[in-house]
């Protein structure tokens, strides 16, 4: 096996890591849809899905079979190519962000020195899926949802990036592994508490989750940008939303809660437990908060979150300069 050089071995290991992380993230995103329905039932003092399988354990399989056999319909008035490519972008964009998230000290697909910038790039790419879906459907409700999504994403991605800069300044690196290692003695949640708050809010908005689900507000836009989608195309949008939740939860853990670090248990177990906690917080937020008006969402971002992020960044810079003297 002379062809099995160290370079080839490294490539094969990287591909193996990518496949494993892909399968785990997609599986977690799919199971979260069932877990959300059960937890919402618990929070609202009612039964969740409990008919298919033992205590509803096979509900996810039933939903997948139902969605697989639904008619994959494309409207005659739609732009077929863009209409088809939009759910693929929605599914794959935030999934790419897990390539840079270190699950443990040795398990990361791409240990990029510009990892933070890569995440901001794929987060910005996700909005194109919504824009393509809304525009190509040639439906007024879809188009309104796409316009809302573009305005909301542009607004909230401003302080999504600014909220990370305090962490980057403290760690001295854009590399996520270096950021985790810099939290060996103290997690960033303590010195960067306001950065965590604004990043979490922006993360919910980027995922278009309640209460920032303005692009698909059912009561106003009849499900918004994916109103014309059915079958597996709708399934890609549906699972892609939950993959975004997993990705944002993993990044919150990596940036502010020490990543894989923790006592006694293996590192990947700690990462999974922390990420699962924040995935549950997404569900709790949906069960607890009402949906505000669209103008209130935009005003909250520009008038409250952005100034708070800038103040946090200025204070962080002042503390770093003071300690350097």
From Swiss-Prot:
Main location: membrane
Pfam families per the UniProt record, alphabetical: NADHdh
Topology relative to the membrane: Multi-pass membrane protein
Keyword field contains Hydrolase: no
Single GO term (MF): NADH dehydrogenase activity
One BP annotation, GO: aerobic respiration
PROSITE patterns given in the database record: COMPLEX1_ND1_1, COMPLEX1_ND1_2
Catalytic activity, EC: 7.1.1.-
Family that this chain belongs to: Belongs to the complex I subunit 1 family.
Record function comment: NDH-1 shuttles electrons from NADH, via FMN and iron-sulfur (Fe-S) centers, to quinones in the respiratory chain. The immediate electron acceptor for the enzyme in this species is believed to be ubiquinone. Couples the redox reaction to proton translocation (for every two electrons transferred, four hydrogen ions are translocated across the cytoplasmic membrane), and thus conserves the redox energy in a proton gradient. This subunit may bind ubiquinone.
Record-given protein name: NADH-quinone oxidoreductase subunit H
Originating organism: Proteus mirabilis (strain HI4320)
């Amino acid at each position: 096996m002379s062809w099995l050089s160290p370079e080839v071995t490294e490539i094969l290991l990287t591909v193996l890591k990518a496949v494993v992380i892909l399968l785990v993230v997609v599986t977690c995103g799919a199971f979260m849809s069932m877990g959300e329905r059960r937890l919402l039932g618990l929070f609202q003092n009612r039964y969740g899905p409990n008919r298919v399988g033992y205590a509803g354990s096979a509900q996810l399989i039933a939903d997948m079979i139902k969605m697989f056999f639904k008619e994959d319909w494309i409207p005659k008035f739609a732009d077929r190519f863009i209409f088809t490519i939009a759910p693929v972008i929605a599914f794959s964009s935030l999934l790419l962000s897990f390539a840079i998230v270190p699950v443990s000290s040795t398990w990361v697909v791409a240990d990029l020195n510009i990892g933070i910038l890569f995440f901001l790039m794929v987060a910005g790419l996700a909005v194109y899926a919504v824009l393509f879906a809304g525009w190509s459907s040639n439906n007024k409700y879809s188009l309104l949802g796409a316009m809302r999504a573009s305005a909301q994403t542009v607004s909230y991605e401003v302080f999504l990036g600014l909220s990370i800069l305090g962490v980057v300044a403290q760690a001295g690196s854009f590399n996520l592994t270096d950021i985790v290692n810099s939290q060996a003695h103290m997690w960033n949640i303590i010195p960067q508490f306001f950065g965590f708050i604004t990043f979490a809010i922006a993360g919910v908005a980027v995922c278009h989750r309640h209460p920032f689900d303005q692009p698909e507000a059912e009561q106003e836009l009849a499900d918004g940008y994916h109103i014309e989608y059915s079958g597996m195309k709708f399934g890609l949008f549906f699972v892609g939303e939950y993959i975004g939740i997993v990705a944002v939860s993993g990044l919150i853990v990596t940036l502010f809660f020490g990543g894989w670090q923790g006592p006694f248990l293996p590192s990947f177990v700690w990462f999974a437990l922390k990420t699962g906690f924040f995935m549950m917080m997404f569900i709790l937020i949906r069960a607890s908060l009402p949906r505000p008006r669209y103008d209130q969402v935009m005003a909250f971002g520009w008038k409250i979150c952005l100034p708070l992020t800038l103040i946090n960044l200025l204070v962080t810079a002042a503390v770093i300069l003071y300690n350097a003297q």
